[in-house]
Amino acid sequence: MYSLELLQKLFPKTKADVLNRYVEPLNQAAGMYYILDTTTRAAAFIAQVGHESGGFNFVKENLNYSADGLLKVFPKYFPNRQLAEQYQRNPQMIANRVYGGRMGNGPETTGEGYKFCGRGLIQLTGKNNYQRMATDFQCSLDECVAYLETATGACYSAAWFWDVNLLNDLCDKGDFVTLTKRINGGTIGLQDRMHHYQLALQLMG
């Protein structure tokens, strides 16, 4: 079980009232998808969603990058400074360029890259993922977008993503690196994720 005390020890920089909003839906969602069945699963889940959401401080992807940030994080989409400077500090334009034309999104000009940018505790991204969730949750795409930004929706979407991507199996195998890749697409933030995982194991053991 996740308690407010546990979340405060794991994410001490986050305000208690913010963390408290997530305690009940976290336990309900994680319980529904068998994440609370073992300490290993529960610790991995809280470490991963905690990292993805900046310690539960945001449920929508922050794409407010400077030109330098764009060159570093998205070199494939911003190969030179001139282009990066045209997009810097404009999250909508950045999302449409980076996510447009892939993951089920239409081209950059459709605006779907921004509409289906990362949301929820696990940063669900792309129209394909949104559509799959909307189908399973029996809601429209627009309802899905709004739901992901609520505490309840943020928790249930994360636990749902965990389930459909068979992440409990990776937890049971102890493969934290592959688990991170399934969520992040790479290993960005692996050290922080691992730190919170080990701490959660210690606190929940």
What residue spans do the PLM features occupy?
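Extracellular/periplasmic catalytic domains that process cell-envelope and extracellular macromolecules
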Residues: 36-41, 114-117, 150, 174-175
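Low-complexity, Gly/Ser/Thr/Pro-rich intrinsically disordered linker/tail segments
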Residues: 182-205
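Ligand-binding pocket segment of bilobal, Venus flytrap-like solute-binding proteins
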Residues: 157, 162, 166, 182
